[in-house]
């Protein structure tokens, strides 16, 4: 079962960008991610963030912006999460890689809450990644 799931994720990952550009493929991918994400989380626990991080490495700026807009409502919780902070760091580096700015809604959370997040056990890692990405810009 585990090998089949990984094989499936690799095949989806290989065509993720192409599928996300197609309107029907994009809707199906969004549904798939929600179900596959919960399945991965239940099967692998904290290691389920690795496939998500790999997907973020492959995406172009349009897809990254779409995913960042999905994070809007619970972005601070992701930053503070033991596993979610790694996904947010990868998202920040994805924006840096593509040469576009992190959306204002996410940047404002990082800037306005930076003192609080710097004191947080996991939040400080995201603040450091954000600082490095803005310094290197």
From Swiss-Prot:
Mapped Pumilio repeat ranges: 70-105, 108-137
Parts of the chain that traverse the membrane: none
One of the record's GO molecular function terms: RNA binding
GO biological process: regulation of translation
InterPro entries given in the database record: ARM-like, ARM-type_fold
Any one of the GO CC terms: cytoplasm
Entry keyword set: Cytoplasm, Repeat, RNA-binding, Translation regulation
Domain of life: Eukaryota
Subcellular location: Cytoplasm
Function per UniProt: Sequence-specific RNA-binding protein that regulates translation and mRNA stability by binding the 3'-UTR of target mRNAs.
Domain comment (free text): The pumilio repeats mediate the association with RNA by packing together to form a right-handed superhelix that approximates a half donut. The number as well as the specific sequence of the repeats determine the specificity for target mRNAs.
Protein name: Putative pumilio homolog 25
